């Protein structure tokens, strides 16, 4: 596919360009292109991920000494050891009327939900889960299709610090049973 689908009006306003500028300033580099950034990232894994965390402004608690404990990328790598973050906290940081999610389900009309409404619905469900006794570390499983309400349930669960697991009914009884 060679057709350009979208091109930014001003390259300097893009996040990738702003990130490259930050890397250049922080690490005394002269990266100019995405390809330059890519090569720098694979040769400077810890610096790249530290810069990514800083640029993204992800909220977290704790401190880390090392970005990762093993430069060999295997299944036992520990990233930002000593740091905890809450998925829902970071996804629910916005509370305005901009569109947060567009839901498209086969044979149904599209639905949209704003950040404000998403926050309200997550807050309402997380309160109900707390009233049921769900607390940090508990497990909550959802047997539901991949629809907007599943996202709300996941965010409500993780906002408490509980662990969310879901399975769509399309998987069939045996697959769902194996998964849970």
Which stretches of residues belong to each language-model region?
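C-terminal catalytic core of Y-nucleophile DNA break-rejoin enzymes
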Residues: 169
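N-terminal amphipathic, basic-rich helices that act as targeting or association modules
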Residues: 1-75
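Conserved AMP-binding/adenylate-forming core of the ANL superfamily
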Residues: 36-40, 101-155, 172-177
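A short N-terminal helical cap/helix-turn-helix that marks the beginning
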Residues: 42, 50-63, 81-102
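Structured binding elements
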Residues: 161
């Amino acid at each position: 596919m060679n057709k350009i689908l979208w091109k930014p009006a001003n390259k300097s306003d893009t996040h990738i360009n702003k990130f490259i500028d930050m890397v250049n300033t922080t690490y005394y580099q002269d990266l100019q292109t995405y390809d330059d950034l890519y090569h720098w990232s694979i040769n400077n894994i810890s610096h790249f991920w530290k810069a990514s965390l800083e640029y993204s402004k992800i909220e977290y608690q704790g401190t880390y000494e090392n970005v990762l404990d093993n430069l060999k990328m295997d299944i036992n790598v520990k990233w930002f050891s000593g740091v905890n973050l809450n998925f829902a906290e970071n996804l629910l940081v916005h509370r305005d009327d901009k569109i947060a999610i567009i839901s498209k389900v086969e044979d149904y009309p599209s639905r949209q939900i704003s950040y404000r409404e998403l926050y309200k619905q997550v807050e309402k469900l997380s309160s109900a889960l707390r009233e049921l006794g769900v607390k940090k570390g508990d497990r909550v499983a959802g047997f539901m299709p991949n629809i907007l309400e599943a996202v709300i349930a996941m965010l409500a669960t993780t906002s408490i610090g509980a662990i969310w697991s879901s399975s769509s009914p399309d998987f069939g009884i045996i697959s769902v049973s194996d998964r849970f």
